Amino acid sequence: MLKVAFQMDEDVVVGRDVSVKLVEEAQRRGHEVFFYRPTSLAFVCGELVAEAFSVRVGADSLHFHDKTRLPLGKLDMLFVRQNPPFDMRYVTTTYLLERLDILMINNPKAIRDHPEKLLPLSFPKFIPPTLITESVSEISAFYAEYGDIVLKPLYDYGGNGVCRICGRADVGAISSAMVERYEAPLVAQQFIDDISSDKRVVLLGGRPIGAVRRKVTAMGEIRTNLRVGATPEATELSDREREICHDVGMLLSSVDILFAGIDILGGHLIEVNVTSPCGILEINQVYGKTLERDCWDYFEYALLHRSP
């Protein structure tokens, strides 16, 4: 039996959240599972602890009981799965966690060093025309060149704050308001007019274990995130998409990011989700799989073969 903890948000939903499915599979294997909120993390006189609860998955909710002061260094495995925003509070947890000598999914230093919308910059041949800035004049010039762009906050997630700018839109006013709201640079990319090609690929140990096409169902919606209601469908990966998965997977494996999700649109790499990857529930649904079992098989293998 392994002693396992999940650092995650409390508002996860049974049947809709990958973290819950991973907890459920851990329970099925007989592991002891704890939950704690990131805000309960504390470095106390040389020891990293958290106010944690034993957790079990019920029919429609998680059940927390037996509150305890959990020494994280005595765990066998820790899942770092709280959602962005990727702010200084989030970053601070990665500085504290990287002191632990246990298996973490994912490596907190790697999470910190590879923000999800910046990581694709390491693969320039795969990304669409991209601008990262908080300069309104630079965004306006980018819009003037491409005429149809997508603007999104750099450190949020799940499609939050994403907007398309085209036609006679006041790009200056929109970008200025977004910079003020998010207090961070923005990502601007040329709009890819082929949202029917949007895919989520799940990588485990740097290799793709499943993919779905994400179909937009709402009229006028450009966001294909599963969190905002896109419908998953079966798909095949093209040669270029497999090349993207291979190259990204090589990088992720080299920095101990064991579990990740890749967003591909029109043959372009858009984002790499390393904080709280989702997608396995939808792949299970479409293909009748149980990927949480494959994930746990790999995590246990990684623990067994972990270098001292």
UniProtKB/Swiss-Prot annotation:
A GO CC term attached to the entry: cytoplasm
Protein's UniProt keywords contain Manganese: yes
Keywords: ATP-binding, Glutathione biosynthesis, Ligase, Magnesium, Manganese, Metal-binding, Nucleotide-binding
Cofactor: Mg(2+); Mn(2+)
PROSITE patterns in the cross-refs: ATP_GRASP
Keyword Nucleotide-binding: yes
Cofactor note: Binds 1 Mg(2+) or Mn(2+) ion per subunit.
EC number(s) given by UniProt: 6.3.2.3
Domain named ATP-grasp: residues: 117-300
Pathway where it operates: Sulfur metabolism; glutathione biosynthesis; glutathione from L-cysteine and L-glutamate: step 2/2
Protein family: Belongs to the prokaryotic GSH synthase family.
PANTHER family (alphabetical): GLUTATHIONE SYNTHETASE, RIBOSOMAL PROTEIN S6 MODIFICATION PROTEIN
Stated name of the protein: Glutathione synthetase
Taxonomy of the source species: Bacteria, Pseudomonadati, Pseudomonadota, Alphaproteobacteria, Rickettsiales
